[in-house]
Amino acid sequence: MSLQPVPHRLLFSDSDDEEDGHSTGEDSAFQESDSPVSRLREKQEGPGGSWEEEEGLGSSPIKSPGHFFMCDSPTYRDLPPASPPGPAASPPDCPGTPPHKTFRKLRLFDTPHTPKSLLSKARGIGSSALRFRGGTLFREAEKLPKPEFTYSTPQVNINPFTPDSLEIQSSTGLCRRRKRALLNDSCGEDMEGSDCELEDEDVRPAKRIPITESNMKSRYATEFHELEKIGSGEFGSVFKCVKRLDGCIYAIKRSKKPMAGSVDEQNALREVYAHAVLGQHPHVVRYYSAWAEDDHMLIQNEYCNGGSLADAISENYRTMQYFTEPELKDLLLQVARGLKYIHSMSLVHMDIKPSNIFISRITVPNTGVEEGDDEDCGSGNVVYKIGDLGHVTRVSSPQVEEGDSRFLANEVLQEDYTHLAKADIFALALTVWCAAGAEPFPTNGDQWHEIRQGKLPRVPQLLSQEFVDLIKLMISPDSEKRPSSMALVKHSVLLSASRKNAEQLRIELNAEKFKNALLQKELKKAQIAKAAAEERALFPDRIATRSTTQSNRTTRLIGKKMNRSVSLTIY
């Protein structure tokens, strides 16, 4: 009697939970003793049963998607067709059903696809890194580099100039410890140690400048039409642009080099932080937005049609025409107002110089002076604005980066940061003196030290002694003796009788009106008291008779605190 091979059919349990179909690679990498098929085989065949007897799988009336993947395999095509099962070979309790989800756990979509090879493969990948399922269809995805660890915390920047930034930074330490513990627990044996070792700043990651915009259109080219290049510096170039949507002109500052990881990156972010905190002020260049393109930072600022103060000074040198004393006082007063606003926010500029002061010329009909006009325009409708906030720092926790050495105070060079606001006053004095016609200041040497000792260089014009004394006071070697920005905006030299602004005149007028009202009130009281005293002295009998008549009059109380006389009319 010839023996026919008895085909074996894999049995799968239906008791698996639904979520097993979504398990990871580690869940599907099972051991032979843990497999439900092995347990069933042990019951049916005993210890002599072996996976090696398996030669093929029974056909199913419904083909799974994996069938088409296996058909492409050369090993699958070379297999002989399975013999049709006989009546005695088909287990009555295992009808032909579609492949169960446990079937996918066997990873039969790869070749070779014998149970023994699958188990050995499962053991091999059980302790390795997680991989994609799906066999050759997703084989290309496995070749991709390992994606970076994703954080649940969104990437945001912490503005160091906001009032609540200190509170956020103080609470960051606790969050770092908690998140580090969670990350250490989540790192398994299959992950490299470098994946779990995170820096402190990675726990709350900051949004960095580099942004991949290969699939995005340039915002600069889409939203703005470039007119001309109006300036350049260490940071980059400034372009005059028209926004296509509103038709207004803006100044777009673009960094020269890619800023990702460079020293200028922090300066650019510091400028954006300072602009966002300061908001809008008449004597600070207005900020609108900032973004990054191809690792370059772009900042959209207000366009000042008068250029910079440095350009005006260069033109004055060429034409031998300098700022007059009233113009110098107006320049000093307006920039002092801008510094007063910056200092009131507990910030310091740290880079005041002619190239960072911009001029805006406003054409306004001559309709008279109104309230508040002093903050919007100076003499001749010229407004001076402070710009380039890349060196701004906080007074309480300074991170000082030295600006231009020609306008740098000596105490900053000596790393004495106790009076940083007075360093801005020192730089402002030299800026005004430069506009007065002084020669360009040295970057070092004996003349540099003479200026720090309070000696001003000569200027080609005659200025009043009180104005010169004010400039000398602003560059005093003792920083404590220098006037503050608050004192400058109220200084008598800058607010002379002929140059008092409308607000100052209104305040003085209201004060005089209040004094006049008080005097009139006191005068009226004195007049009433004097008249009463004279009446008592001249007519004492009349006053006594009047009081007696009023007391003898019959009255009746009606209502609350109301006396009415009783009258009777007889018809």
Curated annotation (Swiss-Prot):
Region (Disordered): 1-101
SUPFAM superfamilies: Protein kinase-like (PK-like) (SSF56112)
Coiled coil: 500-539
EC number: 2.7.10.2
One Pfam family of this chain: Pkinase
A Gene Ontology biological process term: cell division
Subcellular localization, as worded in the UniProt entry: Nucleus
Binding positions for ATP per the UniProt entry: 230-238, 253
Binding site residues for Mg(2+): 356, 388
Reactions listed under catalytic activity: L-tyrosyl-[protein] + ATP = O-phospho-L-tyrosyl-[protein] + ADP + H(+)
Disulfide bonds: none
Keywords from the named record: ATP-binding, Cell cycle, Cell division, Coiled coil, Kinase, Magnesium, Metal-binding, Mitosis, Nucleotide-binding, Nucleus, Transferase, Tyrosine-protein kinase
Function: Acts as a zygotic negative regulator of entry into mitosis (G2 to M transition) by protecting the nucleus from cytoplasmically activated cyclin B1-complexed cdk1 before the onset of mitosis by mediating phosphorylation of cdk1 on 'Tyr-15'. Specifically phosphorylates and inactivates cyclin B1-complexed cdk1 reaching a maximum during G2 phase and a minimum as cells enter M phase. Phosphorylation of cyclin B1-cdk1 occurs exclusively on 'Tyr-15' and phosphorylation of monomeric cdk1 does not occur.
Family: Belongs to the protein kinase superfamily. Ser/Thr protein kinase family. WEE1 subfamily.
UniProt name for this protein: Wee1-like protein kinase 1-A
Organism annotation: Xenopus laevis
Species classification: Eukaryota, Metazoa, Chordata, Craniata, Vertebrata
